[in-house]
From Swiss-Prot:
The keyword DNA-binding does not apply. This is Transcription antitermination protein NusB. GO terms for molecular function: RNA binding. HAMAP family: NusB.
Length: 142
């Protein structure tokens, strides 16, 4: 099994959640393998990869607690805005960051916030990164 650091696991969590959002008929295990075996793209036969426990924790946590996460995030949107108006990558990063901030015993809230901003830097634009920082920082202060 490849060794994944926490940052790579968070990237994979984002990618799995994004994949599931885009293709809701996809099985969770298939989404994991699609993301975790990307480096085997050219291989004739793909070798399945064991899903790291922290990745499963993040993905299952976000999917199982999506309604509660959305309810917690909604008050921090601009007046008249709804989560459905947000770009999907931004919403997924917000959910992932908030879940980790509230539920991980391994990453302090400030670390989870910083990691969410790293994901935003990689998967969104500067304006979205500022928005994500503004929303999630409210939960660090709380």
């Amino acid at each position: 099994m490849p060794n994944f650091n926490r940052h790579q696991i968070r990237q994979a969590a984002f990618q799995v959640l994004f994949t599931l959002n885009a293709n809701q008929s996809l099985e969770l295990e298939d989404a994991y393998q699609a993301v975790l075996t990307m480096d085997q793209f050219d291989a004739e036969e793909v070798t399945p990869v064991e899903v790291p426990a922290y990745l499963a924790f993040l993905v299952s946590g976000v999917t199982e607690n999506q309604a509660a996460l959305d309810a917690a995030l909604t008050p921090y949107l601009k007046k008249g805005w709804q989560l459905s108006r947000l770009a999907k990558p931004d919403l997924i990063i917000l959910r992932l960051g908030l879940f980790e901030m509230q539920n991980s015993t391994e990453a302090p809230a400030k670390v989870a916030l910083n990691e969410a901003l790293e994901l935003a830097k990689q998967f969104t634009d500067d304006q979205a990164k500022g928005f994500i920082n503004g929303v999630l920082s409210k939960f660090v202060e709380a």
